[in-house]
Amino acid sequence: MMAKPKKTIPAKLSDERIVIYDKDGISRLNEKRYGELHENFLSLSFVEGLYLVSKNWISLRDKNKKLLSFEELFDVAQNIDRKLCIRYLAYKDLRNRGYTVRTGLKYGSDFRLYERSNIDEIHSRYLVKVFSEEIPCEISEITGFVRVAHSVRKELIIAIVDADGSVVYYNMGYLKL
C-alpha cells in the first residue's frame, strides 16, 4: 500500500520573504531546518521558497491570493536578487546532497552549511560563496571571503555554477608554509 502524501503547506508571498502561518507546516519545515522561526510564523528566503515549491511542499499565494508557480515566484524574486539563479542552483544542489543550508548574510557569504550528520549542531562548519563561471571575479574578493571565514573559525567553500547549471565546489583557506 502506498503512503498517503502529506498535504502541501499554505504559504504567502510577503514583500521579500515567504511566510508560513500554518502550525503543522511550521513544525514540519522547522524540523527539516527550513526558514527562520518567529513567534507565530516561519519566514523563508526566496531560494528556500523556490526549492520547496519545486518539491511541491508549499503552495504559495500572492497578496491577491493567486497561486504562484515556480516560474512566477522566480520572476518576482529575480527582480529583487540579481544572483538568484546561481544561488538557487547551489542551494538546490546542496539540499539534494542532504546538507542543511542556512543564510550566510551575517558573514558576507551566500550560505552557512551544516554537516549532514550534525543537523542539531549549533554552529555551521562552512561558509559558501556562490559565483557564476561566466562572470569574472577578482582574487582580492576571494581573499577577503577567506579572511572573514577564517576570522569566524569556518571553512570557505566557493561554489561555481556553470552555464549548464552544474555546480563545482572548491574549499578555500590559508596554507602556512
Swiss-Prot record:
CDD domains the UniProt entry points to: tRNA-intron_lyase_C
Catalytic residues of the enzyme: Y114, H123, K154
Enzyme Commission code: 4.6.1.16
Top-level taxon of the source organism: Archaea
SUPFAM superfamilies linked: tRNA-intron endonuclease catalytic domain-like, tRNA-intron endonuclease N-terminal domain-like
Keywords: Lyase, tRNA processing
Cellular component terms per the entry's GO annotation: cytoplasm
GO terms of molecular function: lyase activity; nucleic acid binding; tRNA-intron endonuclease activity
UniProt cross-references to Pfam families, sorted A to Z: tRNA_int_endo (PF01974), tRNA_int_endo_N (PF02778)
Keyword presence, Amino-acid biosynthesis: no
InterPro entries: tRNA_endonuc-like_dom_sf, tRNA_intron_Endo_cat-like_sf, tRNA_intron_Endonuc_cat-like, tRNA_intron_Endonuc_N, tRNA_intron_Endonuc_N_sf, tRNA_splic, tRNA_splic_arch_short
UniProt-listed GO biological process terms: tRNA splicing, via endonucleolytic cleavage and ligation
Reaction(s) the record says it catalyses: pretRNA = a 3'-half-tRNA molecule with a 5'-OH end + a 5'-half-tRNA molecule with a 2',3'-cyclic phosphate end + an intron with a 2',3'-cyclic phosphate and a 5'-hydroxyl terminus
Family statement: Belongs to the tRNA-intron endonuclease family. Archaeal short subfamily.
Function: Endonuclease that removes tRNA introns. Cleaves pre-tRNA at the 5'- and 3'-splice sites to release the intron. The products are an intron and two tRNA half-molecules bearing 2',3' cyclic phosphate and 5'-OH termini. Recognizes a pseudosymmetric substrate in which 2 bulged loops of 3 bases are separated by a stem of 4 bp.
Subunit note: Homotetramer; although the tetramer contains four active sites, only two participate in the cleavage. Therefore, it should be considered as a dimer of dimers.
Protein name per its UniProtKB record: tRNA-splicing endonuclease
Lineage: Archaea, Methanobacteriati, Methanobacteriota, Methanomada group, Methanococci
